[in-house]
């Protein structure tokens, strides 16, 4: 007996089987059955339209973007005849299929009449998916909702790896992997790397669900991304009441608000002002401000699922941008908070207005660094708290930063008193001051510190020329400090600051005032290495250059002060630089003489410290380089590797660091591209090839060095692991002299044809091999 059209017959396992009559269009609708799923009664298709079915099913399918598109495109513009379908009469051809809008199928069609076991609706072809590996058929919206709660098949309770969708007659298909399950993560990642994934399902907490993921070079974006907002009215009220933050004052990227002044109007018509935080704080809890700056007003729609919340979020910014926005936030504020991380709520917004009452300076990346040699008695004028700007300055808007704060720390106009000793120094220092326009509290303090250093240099010039302001005096030159600075510290601190200034000028490309400024080609690398040496390894200067050095002692400072005081008056073109250079040179010479008298320090050269005059002896290496001293040294852990110097584009400088190690001298290895020292070669005796080349280049080295004629020990590398000599005779072998290398590994020596030794340093023929290898 064939069933009537419009009626369905239920099997005990819950799957209906429909066998319609030939040439009859059948539209079964299981939604018209009674509430009990076990009922066997046959009912007629009632007068319910697809609109009622859409309302009933919206709670389970509202979170899926593809379902919303399907319902909007197919069910929205078309209507359904409300009359009952009479038994045996085919429906009209233009009526869409019921239960999800499945198109009508002819009798004998394939598996288009499958019913989803979750929603008990007929599965539309474009919403059909098969679970893997159990291959049960469901609709995509139901499985995406189900899989977020439990990664198992609704029928057989098997762990699922991915969903198979979009199967074509040719056999191609796409997948929707489940990427957050630890048990099936590997198989799901393989599906993503294969390039078949068109969407992904994130199980567990949806607040941490990403919008896209990338595996194996393939990026998969979520077709229906989740949002951090909860989907129920109770959760909305509780969460938003706890994190509620008044909308004002807020900072926009273009016009940061000021304390005590109204923020400039934002493009889009937002009318929330800074002086209204109290009015905004009294907003009712029923319309709180969401984490994204929109007011959730459509609470009825939110209760049905994620779809309603998206509609309210889309409509809220448009409604809140009018002149009477109330608690709503304007478009400008929404744009300002669009770049915030997802999931971050109110506490990020509840910040004071920037630069209104904040005492911390703003550090700018391009500002010059603070001087590490700042005297402790010199205060920073820019660090004092400043009162808030007046209302007139605040109303100027974005034109606030530069012109408003520049006069706060700039020096007063030059008067006749302070500039009298050095009339030519002011035009030379004016362009430097004009370039350093302070941008924040930190840069203002640094600029003031530099101006104080220049004033100290001018005071040094005044003392050297016999003018007012000599040791301990308070002449006009001390009044040149900007912004009413405190009296300058003692003469030793002034000379120490003046000795540091030439190093900064030399780093910025200015001229070195020292008379002996000639430097070898490798001077920058040597100066950089010498600047990083501790005080125990390198002297404060060398060869009369005003290079970097350690802080001066009291005796050296007094000597440099007396030298600077007895110097002649400089020319007007370079007053400050000449005085600072003379003080640095005299300080270096005096401190070098004092250290040379002790006999334990060394002078500085372009390539590092050189031996000082006096008795010498073995001393520690500055870089803690040590050598094996015992005869029974432990062999190396693997095969010996040899890297040619030409392979790393480096050169060995034949300028030894005498007595830098316990047993020998060091030769620096310089990078040819940068000129920096990248490594050191340690000599252990005077008979090696490198020692021979060094002796030829520097004849006096053999008289100064303390190296022995022949090293008394050597490290024993391990023997080559393969015994047969035939394996060594391959195309990869490269003979170099009487040594044999295999891709950089030394494997043999003495004779390329006979290979009497596995390794030139092996214990069997070690002595003869070494002797022949050096010849």
UniProtKB/Swiss-Prot annotation:
<feature type="compositionally biased region" description="Basic and acidic residues">
    <location>
        <begin position="10"/>
        <end position="21"/>
    </location>
</feature>
<feature type="region of interest" description="Disordered">
    <location>
        <begin position="221"/>
        <end position="636"/>
    </location>
</feature>
<dbReference type="InterPro" id="IPR001841">
    <property type="entry name" value="Znf_RING"/>
</dbReference>
<keyword id="KW-0863">Zinc-finger</keyword>
<dbReference type="InterPro" id="IPR017907">
    <property type="entry name" value="Znf_RING_CS"/>
</dbReference>
<comment type="function">
    <text>SUMO-targeted ubiquitin ligase that plays an essential role in nuclear antiviral defense evasion triggered by dsDNA viruses. Acts during the initial stages of lytic infection and the reactivation of latent viral genome. Prevents the antiviral effect of nuclear bodies by degrading host PML, SP100 and MORC3. Prevents antiviral response to viral DNA induced by IFI16 by degrading it. Additionally, inhibits host IRF3 nuclear signaling to prevent interferon production by the infected cells.</text>
</comment>
<feature type="compositionally biased region" description="Pro residues">
    <location>
        <begin position="369"/>
        <end position="390"/>
    </location>
</feature>
<keyword id="KW-1130">Modulation of host ubiquitin pathway by virus</keyword>
<dbReference type="GO" id="GO:0039502">
    <property type="term" value="P:symbiont-mediated suppression of host type I interferon-mediated signaling pathway"/>
</dbReference>
<keyword id="KW-1121">Modulation of host cell cycle by virus</keyword>
<dbReference type="GO" id="GO:0039593">
    <property type="term" value="P:symbiont-mediated perturbation of host exit from mitosis"/>
</dbReference>
<dbReference type="Pfam" id="PF00097">
    <property type="entry name" value="zf-C3HC4"/>
</dbReference>
<keyword id="KW-1090">Inhibition of host innate immune response by virus</keyword>
<dbReference type="InterPro" id="IPR018957">
    <property type="entry name" value="Znf_C3HC4_RING-type"/>
</dbReference>
<protein>
    <recommendedName>
        <fullName>E3 ubiquitin-protein ligase ICP0</fullName>
        <ecNumber>2.3.2.27</ecNumber>
    </recommendedName>
</protein>
<keyword id="KW-0808">Transferase</keyword>
<keyword id="KW-1128">Modulation of host ubiquitin pathway by viral E3 ligase</keyword>
<dbReference type="GO" id="GO:0039648">
    <property type="term" value="P:symbiont-mediated perturbation of host ubiquitin-like protein modification"/>
</dbReference>
<dbReference type="GO" id="GO:0019046">
    <property type="term" value="P:release from viral latency"/>
</dbReference>
<keyword id="KW-0945">Host-virus interaction</keyword>
<dbReference type="GO" id="GO:0034340">
    <property type="term" value="P:response to type I interferon"/>
</dbReference>
<feature type="compositionally biased region" description="Low complexity">
    <location>
        <begin position="422"/>
        <end position="431"/>
    </location>
</feature>
<keyword id="KW-1098">Inhibition of host mitotic exit by virus</keyword>
<keyword id="KW-1113">Inhibition of host RLR pathway by virus</keyword>
<keyword id="KW-0479">Metal-binding</keyword>
<dbReference type="InterPro" id="IPR013083">
    <property type="entry name" value="Znf_RING/FYVE/PHD"/>
</dbReference>
<keyword id="KW-0597">Phosphoprotein</keyword>
<comment type="similarity">
    <text>Belongs to the simplexviruses ICp0 family.</text>
</comment>
<dbReference type="GO" id="GO:0042025">
    <property type="term" value="C:host cell nucleus"/>
</dbReference>
<feature type="compositionally biased region" description="Low complexity">
    <location>
        <begin position="550"/>
        <end position="592"/>
    </location>
</feature>
<keyword id="KW-1035">Host cytoplasm</keyword>
<dbReference type="GO" id="GO:0000209">
    <property type="term" value="P:protein polyubiquitination"/>
</dbReference>
<keyword id="KW-0862">Zinc</keyword>
<feature type="compositionally biased region" description="Low complexity">
    <location>
        <begin position="391"/>
        <end position="409"/>
    </location>
</feature>
<keyword id="KW-1092">Inhibition of host IRF3 by virus</keyword>
<dbReference type="GO" id="GO:0030430">
    <property type="term" value="C:host cell cytoplasm"/>
</dbReference>
<feature type="compositionally biased region" description="Polar residues">
    <location>
        <begin position="439"/>
        <end position="453"/>
    </location>
</feature>
<keyword id="KW-0238">DNA-binding</keyword>
<dbReference type="GO" id="GO:0004842">
    <property type="term" value="F:ubiquitin-protein transferase activity"/>
</dbReference>
<feature type="compositionally biased region" description="Low complexity">
    <location>
        <begin position="310"/>
        <end position="321"/>
    </location>
</feature>
<keyword id="KW-0804">Transcription</keyword>
<feature type="region of interest" description="Disordered">
    <location>
        <begin position="1"/>
        <end position="112"/>
    </location>
</feature>
């Amino acid at each position: 007996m064939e069933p009537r059209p419009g009626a369905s017959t239920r099997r005990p396992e819950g799957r209906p089987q429909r066998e319609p009559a030939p040439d009859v269009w059948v539209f079964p609708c299981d939604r018209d059955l009674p509430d009990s799923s076990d009922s066997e009664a046959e009912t007629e298709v009632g007068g319910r339209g697809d609109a009622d079915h859409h309302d009933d099913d919206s709670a389970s399918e509202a979170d899926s973007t593809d379902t919303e598109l399907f319902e909007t495109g197919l069910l929205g513009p078309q209507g359904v005849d409300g009359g009952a379908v009479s038994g045996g009469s085919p429906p009209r051809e233009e009526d869409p299929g019921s239960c999800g809008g499945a198109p009508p199928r002819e009798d004998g069609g394939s598996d288009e009449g499958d019913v989803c076991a979750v929603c008990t609706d007929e599965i539309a072809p474009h919403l059909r998916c098969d679970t893997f590996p159990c291959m049960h058929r469901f609709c995509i919206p139901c499985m995406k909702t189900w899989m977020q709660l439990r990664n198992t098949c609704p029928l057989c309770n098997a762990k699922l790896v991915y969903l198979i969708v979009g199967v074509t007659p040719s056999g191609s298909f796409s997948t929707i992997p489940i990427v957050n399950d630890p048990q099936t993560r590997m198989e799901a990642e393989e599906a993503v790397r294969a390039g078949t994934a068109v969407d992904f399902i994130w199980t567990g907490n949806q607040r941490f669900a990403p919008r896209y993921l990338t595996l194996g070079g393939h990026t998969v974006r979520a077709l229906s991304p989740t949002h951090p907002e909860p989907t129920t009215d109770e959760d909305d009220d509780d969460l938003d009441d706890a994190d509620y933050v008044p909308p004002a004052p807020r900072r926009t990227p273009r016009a940061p608000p000021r304390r005590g002044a109204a923020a400039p109007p934002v493009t889009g018509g937002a009318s929330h002002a800074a002086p209204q935080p109290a009015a905004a704080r009294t907003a009712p809890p029923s319309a709180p401000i969401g984490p994204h700056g929109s007011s959730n007003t459509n609470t009825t729609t939110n209760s049905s699922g994620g779809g309603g919340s998206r509609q309210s979020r889309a409509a809220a910014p448009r409604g809140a941008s009018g002149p009477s926005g109330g608690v709503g936030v304007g478009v400008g504020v929404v744009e300002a908070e669009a770049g915030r991380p997802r999931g971050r709520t109110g506490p990020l917004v509840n910040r004071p207005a920037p630069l209104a009452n904040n005492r911390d300076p703003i550090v700018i990346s391009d500002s010059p660094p603070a001087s590490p040699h700042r005297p402790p008695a010199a205060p920073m004028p820019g660090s004092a708290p400043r009162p808030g700007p007046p209302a007139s300055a605040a109303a100027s808007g974005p034109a606030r930063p530069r012109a408003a704060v520049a006069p706060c720390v700039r020096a007063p106009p030059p008067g006749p008193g302070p500039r009298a000793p050095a009339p030519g120094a002011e035009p030379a220092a004016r362009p430097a001051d004009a370039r350093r326009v302070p941008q924040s509290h930190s840069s203002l303090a640094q600029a003031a510190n530099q101006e104080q250093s220049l004033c100290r240099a001018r005071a040094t010039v005044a003392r050297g020329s016999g003018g007012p302001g000599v040791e301990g005096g308070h002449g006009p030159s001390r009044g040149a400090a900007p912004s009413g600075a405190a009296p300058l510290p003692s003469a030793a601190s002034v000379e120490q600051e003046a000795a540091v200034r030439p190093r900064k000028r030399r780093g910025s490309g200015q001229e070195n005032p020292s008379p002996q400024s000639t430097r070898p080609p490798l001077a920058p690398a040597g100066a950089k290495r010498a600047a990083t040496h501790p005080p125990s390894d390198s002297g404060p200067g060398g060869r009369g250059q005003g290079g970097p050095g350690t802080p001066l002692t009291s005796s050296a400072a007094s000597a440099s002060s007396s030298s600077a005081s007895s110097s002649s008056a400089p020319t007007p073109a370079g007053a400050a630089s000449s005085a600072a250079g003379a003080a640095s040179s005299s300080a270096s010479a005096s401190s070098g003489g004092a250290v040379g008298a002790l006999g334990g320090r060394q002078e500085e050269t372009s390539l590092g410290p050189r031996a000082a005059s006096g008795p010498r002896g073995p001393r520690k290496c500055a870089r803690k380089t040590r050598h094996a001293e015992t005869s029974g040294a432990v062999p190396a852990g693997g095969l010996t590797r040899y890297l040619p110097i030409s392979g790393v584009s480096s050169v060995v400088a034949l300028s030894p660091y005498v007595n830098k190690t316990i047993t020998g001298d060091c030769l620096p290895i310089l990078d040819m591209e940068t000129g920096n020292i990248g490594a050191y070669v340690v000599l252990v005796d005077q008979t090696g090839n490198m020692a021979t080349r060094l002796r030829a280049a520097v004849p006096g080295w053999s008289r100064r060095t303390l190296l022995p004629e022949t090293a008394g020990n050597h490290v024993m590398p391990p023997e080559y692991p393969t015994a047969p000599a035939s394996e060594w005779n391959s195309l990869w072998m490269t003979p170099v002299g009487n040594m044999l290398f295999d891709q950089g590994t030394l494997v043999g020596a003495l004779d390329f044809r006979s290979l009497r030794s596995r390794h030139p340093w092996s214990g069997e023929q070690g002595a003869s091999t070494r002797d022949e290898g050096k010849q």
